[in-house]
Amino acid sequence: VISIEDFQRQRFLLREKGSGTREVFNRVVEQAGIHITPVWEAMSTTALVNATINGLGIAVLSHRMILPALQQGLICTVKAEGLSFSRNFHIIYHKDKFLTASAKKFIALCKDYENDYPLPFYNGLY
């Protein structure tokens, strides 16, 4: 766990403005009263992971997107004291519309995936 002071001193490599990941990051740091100016922004998760591996800074990305590099020991994760980065996804559909068999299977697949592959708590920093 790193302190807020150490967190603020990091060189941040972030997703582009408008991405869901960036929006979560901006909201969390803003609510904590922290101002962060990224040293680099990219649309590519792979580019951000590679930049992190090469020591250019720390990135904030989805845990599922970094698993291969994490499992290979190329990167590690850290928690920032008092900050929690999380993001929820929702399947939405019109309440009065007929759901096809394919749509129902897709919804079931999504629910099963979350149940079969739950993520440990992770705040999104590495």
Where are these regions (language model features)?
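Secondary-structure junction motif
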Residues: 10-32, 99-103, 107-108, 114-125
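A bilobed periplasmic-binding-protein/Venus flytrap-type ligand-binding module shared by bacterial periplasmic
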Residues: 89-99
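Flexible hinge/capping segments at coil-to-helix
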Residues: 1-12
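Hydrophobic hinge/microswitch elements
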Residues: 23-77
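Alpha-helical segments flanking ligand/cofactor-binding loops in enzyme cores
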Residues: 5, 49-50, 104
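Residues embedded in well-ordered beta-strands
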Residues: 11, 58, 76, 90-92
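Short secondary-structure boundary/capping segments
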Residues: 3-5, 30-31, 67, 81-83
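Structured beta->alpha junctions
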Residues: 17, 40, 81-82, 95
